[in-house]
């Protein structure tokens, strides 16, 4: 009896299907890429991906820095233009020497405050 008990515990024969549809292929779990890449290859691909992302991040930061520098140049230019217009408006009302004296005083104050 021990021989008959050990027979059912053995795995079923590959050729015979349980439901009797032997003309169909036996079903297997659908894992097309499972186990195809080794751990070392996955690590290498991950490192490569990280390097690419880091490079992209650096490029983005560089581009953003250029953009901010451009914006700052525009702001500085506009501020200088406004200041010049203000001095011109003052020059219309006052004498030239007094305007120059005020300019110097404002520059001194600006340097002291900054």
Swiss-Prot record:
Compartments, as annotated in UniProt: Nucleus, Nucleolus
Alphabetical keyword list: Coiled coil, Nucleus, Ribosome biogenesis, rRNA processing
Pfam families referenced in this protein's UniProt entry, alphabetically: Cgr1 (PF03879)
Record's keyword annotation contains Nucleus: yes
Region of interest: Disordered: 1-96
Composition skew (Basic and acidic residues), residue ranges: 41-93
Coiled coil: 40-101
Record GO biological process: rRNA processing
Gene Ontology cellular-component terms listed: nucleolus
Function: Involved in nucleolar integrity and required for processing of the pre-rRNA for the 60S ribosome subunit.
Sequence similarity: Belongs to the CGR1 family.
Name listed for the protein in its UniProt record: rRNA-processing protein cgrA
Source organism (scientific name): Aspergillus terreus (strain NIH 2624 / FGSC A1156)
């Amino acid at each position: 009896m021990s021989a008959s008990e050990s027979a059912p515990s053995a795995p079923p024969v590959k050729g015979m299907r349980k439901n009797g549809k032997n003309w169909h292929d036996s079903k297997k779990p659908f894992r097309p890429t499972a186990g195809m890449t080794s751990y070392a290859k996955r690590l290498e691909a991950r490192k490569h991906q990280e390097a690419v992302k880091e490079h992209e991040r650096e490029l983005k930061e560089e581009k953003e820095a250029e953009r901010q520098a451009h914006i700052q140049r525009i702001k500085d230019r506009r501020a200088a233009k406004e200041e010049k217009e203000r001095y011109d408006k003052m020059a219309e009302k006052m004498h030239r020497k007094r305007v120059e004296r005020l300019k110097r005083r404002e520059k001194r104050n600006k340097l002291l405050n900054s």
